[in-house]
Structures are given as structure tokens and as C-alpha cells.
Amino acid sequence: MSIIKMADLTLANQRVLIREDLNVPVTDGKITSDARLRAALPTLKLALEAGAKVMVMSHLGRPTEGQPEEKFSLKPVTDYLSAALNYPVRLVTDYLDGVDVAAGELVVFENIRFNLGEKKNDDTLAKKLAALCDVFVMDAFGTAHRAQASTHGVAKFAATACAGPLLSGELEALGKALDNPARPLVAIVGGSKVSTKLTVLDSLAGIVDQLVVGGGIANTFIAADGHNVGKSLYEADLVEEATRLTKQAKANNGDIPVPSDVVVATEFSASATATLKPVNEVTADEMIFDIGPETAKALTEIIANAGTIVWNGPVGVFEFDQFGEGTKVIAQAIADSSAFSIAGGGDTLAAVDKYEIADKISYISTGGGAFLEFLEGKKLPAVEILEQRAK
């Protein structure tokens, strides 16, 4: 993959427009998780230290285009950056006709989605953004799967278009995990539905040595294995797909192991009583919410022998502690492994935080949808345009 990197360019006195993913959760004007902001800071500091005139843009939430709303403002983000950089960062609301920025100064543009044409990748908007800068830096892996004016269009028209350190790092880590992995390659895919991750499972079943499924996804595989899943969340219409995927994995000398024991309850609530039982004893009124210790132990052994681990999704309803032991054991096994490990997806990152293993994972991806699309083997539009511009 050949793309120009920000680190290779001389940025002194250059107008540098950086697209970051600063889409953080904000409640009552307060940021509740700063993970994406922390991930973006090294890029911003590098550009500032290089003496660039730095402009930063991002979306936040899903406002109606052309209708600015205070709850979607990047003001809390701007305040956070001011504190983190120990420097007064300006929030600029009218920027499309030009902005005065001094060398060594950083400003933040108000929510890019307040502009008409952002989502549709409108050329007029993209050209206006491109005219603001000498160098466009795409650094938002989390939005790289979307062709929008601020991720794709601007890269088409900017004088120079390159990848920032965060995006470059994501692509290198994912490439290391999927293109030329140390074997055995183990992928752990959790989540509620097979349908939302079918293409991911399809793609991975052909390249991994072991595909571990968890959460609601596992229930469909349990049903495909001939067991009763009671009232569990599962997709009856995808049982045949689950059978096909298992056969596909086996044809590739891999496997998709089905849990031997599970943790069940008769209601979905924080106070539900958890019961451990063999997978073939689930009754009609029960729901599966976690894997049992026997299954967790077997998966721990698979993880311990891995050369590369890709983790996307918890294996149980870990938000409730009585159904969190499976995810906790898996998380700890990944943390204890010497394999190259990469974790991505919102729920996965929440589990990484809960069990405090962030420093034990080789690479934590900031992307949700982009991470999944990369796993599916899809081209990311915002990366593709950078490749074209590098030629």
C-alpha cells in the first residue's frame, strides 16, 4: 500500500487541514469517553511542533445537515484540546471562505456535518475545504469507510493529500494481523447478530486457523449444532449459513468451536439469576447470556497458542457482572498472550477498559465500522483516494 505519510512532509508555515475522528460521546456538555481524543493528540502535536498552520475538522453525532445544533457542537472537544495542549484552541464556525491561522497555531472547525453536502461527498464543499489548505491529512480511521466531502472529496482536490500517523498506524497494524500474520491466526467475533457480521465471518473463515464466535452470534451456531437455545437471541433463518461457515472453516483446516457449557437466565436484567449448565440442557424459557467456564478454558488454550489474535466483540453480556466472566477470561487470555493482538469495535473497547488490559493489547483500533469493513476485505474509500493521489 503506497500512500504519502504526514511524517514525510515538511509542514513549516504550511496550511495543514487534518481530518480527525473526534466523534466522542457528550452528555450535558461533558465528554464521557476521551479515547478518540487521546488517540488524535500525537498527530496534532506533531503538526504544531513542525510549525504548521493547523486546522482540524471532524463530525460529532448525527445532526441534520445545514442545521447547526448546540448539542452537536465541537465546543466540548475544543475545550478538551485547549487543556490537553495547554494552549487556547479556537473553535471556528465560519470557515469555508477562509481562515487566518498563524504558524504554530491550531484551530478547530465546527462540526463538519453542519455543512450541506458533507455526507453526499459534494464536490463544491470538497473543493472549498481543499482550497483552505496546502496539505490535507486524513487521520480518521473511524470514518475511512465513508466517502464523504471531509474524508474523500477533499483528498481528491487538495494540493497534497496524505495519511496522518494514527491512520498509518491503524493500516500497518491491520495489515500485520491479516496480510502476513504469525500463525495460528485466531479471530474472536462477538456481538448480537450473525446478519450484521456475516461478511466478516465469511471473509475470516477463509483465512483464520480458529474462528471463535460469541454473544448472540454464538447462539445461532449453537442452534446449527442441533441444540435448543430457548428464548435466546438468535437468527433461525441464518442457521444454514452458520453450518456453511463451519464447513468452510474446516475445509481451510480451521474450526468454529461451539460452546460446551453456557450461562443462562430467564430474564434480561441486571438482577437476573445466572445458572450454569451444559449447552444441551437449555430449556424453552431460558436465554443464553455467556459462555461457561469449561468453554472459556478451552478458548483460553486456543488463545494461548495463537501467533496473531483479532478481537471484535464480547462473548457475553459483560455489562452485567453475572454474565461477564466469559468475556473477562477471554480478555485476560488475550492480555497474557505473547501473540500480536488487535482489538476493535465499541463494545470490545468497553470490555478492554472494564478489565483494564489496554496496555496488554498490541494495537487498539479506533474504528468500529471501518475496522469491520477492513476485516471483510473491503477497500476503504478514504484510503483508496490517498493511494491514487500518491501515484
From Swiss-Prot:
- Pathway it belongs to? Carbohydrate degradation; glycolysis; pyruvate from D-glyceraldehyde 3-phosphate: step 2/5
Q: Could you describe the subunit structure of this protein?
A: Monomer.
Q: What reaction does this catalyse?
A: (2R)-3-phosphoglycerate + ATP = (2R)-3-phospho-glyceroyl phosphate + ADP
UniProt-recorded name of the protein: Phosphoglycerate kinase
Can you list the GO cellular component terms from the UniProt entry? cytosol
Is Kinase a UniProt keyword of this protein? yes
Detail which positions bind ATP.
Answer: 197, 319, 345-348
Record GO terms (molecular function): ADP binding; ATP binding; phosphoglycerate kinase activity
Q: Where in the cell is it found?
A: Cytoplasm
Q: Give the UniProt record's GO annotations in the biological process aspect.
A: gluconeogenesis; glycolytic process
Please list every transmembrane segment annotated in the UniProt record, as residue ranges.
none
Q: What is its main location?
A: cytoplasm
Q: Which gene encodes it?
A: pgk
Q: Where does substrate bind?
A: 21-23, 36, 59-62, 113, 146
Question: Keywords assigned by UniProt?
Answer: ATP-binding, Cytoplasm, Glycolysis, Kinase, Nucleotide-binding, Transferase
Q: Carries keyword DNA-binding? A: no
- Family statement drawn from the similarity comment of this UniProt entry: Belongs to the phosphoglycerate kinase family.
Q: Kindly name one Pfam family recorded for this protein.
A: PGK
Q: Which InterPro entries match?
A: Phosphoglycerate_kinase, Phosphoglycerate_kinase_CS, Phosphoglycerate_kinase_N, Phosphoglycerate_kinase_sf
Q: Where is the signal peptide?
A: none
Per the UniProt record, the lineage of the source organism begins with: Bacteria, Pseudomonadati, Pseudomonadota, Gammaproteobacteria, Alteromonadales
The catalytic activity of this protein is classed by the Enzyme Commission as 2.7.2.3
Query: Whose protein is this, by species?
Result: Colwellia psychrerythraea (strain 34H / ATCC BAA-681)
